[in-house]
């Protein structure tokens, strides 16, 4: 992990990797920064809105949150899809906020469509339009925190 450029842990995985108990957004940011990679994308992070979930992108200089509604009974594969979409955005040269918002919208939309069709796994082949042009509403905000000084 210290050699990685990007890490994409769930909140549970972040707690395990960092050896820290995480109860807040500030705890999440501190634990993510302690991991080492320049970008840590924490999925299933604490959200500000009720019945929502948050994807928190933590870098040495900034933190961006992307929140969307919870979808009960989410199929398997959401973390892998988030990591893949985030990597695709990096390779395309997009800025962090655009990558995060697009990745979160894609995963949220794919989950919602798959759940609607009672699928156990994400319906990637059937719902390809969500991969290319997601329409799901995701709110993004910059988190006011104390970034590390270079």
For the regions a language model picked out, list residue spans one by one:
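Short, small-residue alpha-helix embedded
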Residues: 15-16, 74-96, 100
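Glycine-rich beta-alpha junction loops
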Residues: 13, 44-48, 69-72, 103-108
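Charged C-terminal helix
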Residues: 97-150
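Short pre-catalytic strand/loop immediately N-terminal to key active-site residues, enriched for Gly-Thr
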Residues: 63-77
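Glycine-centered flexibility sites
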Residues: 44-45, 77-79, 93, 118-125
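Conserved phosphate/ATP/ADP-binding segment of small-molecule kinases
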Residues: 1-63, 94-97
């Amino acid at each position: 992990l210290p050699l990685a450029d990007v890490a994409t842990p769930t909140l549970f995985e972040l707690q395990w990797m960092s050896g820290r108990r995480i109860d807040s957004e500030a705890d999440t940011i501190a634990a993510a920064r302690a991991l080492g990679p320049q970008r840590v994308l924490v999925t299933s992070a604490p959200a500000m809105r009720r019945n929502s979930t948050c994807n928190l992108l933590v870098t040495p200089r900034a933190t961006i949150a992307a929140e969307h509604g919870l979808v009960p009974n989410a199929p398997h594969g959401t973390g892998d899809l988030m990591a893949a979409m985030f990597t695709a955005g990096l390779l395309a040269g997009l800025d962090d906020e655009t990558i995060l918002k697009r990745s979160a919208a894609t995963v949220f939309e794919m989950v919602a469509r798959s759940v609607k069709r009672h699928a156990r796994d994400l319906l990637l082949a059937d719902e390809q339009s969500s991969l290319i042009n997601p329409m799901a509403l995701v709110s993004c905000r910059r988190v006011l925190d104390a970034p590390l000084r270079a």
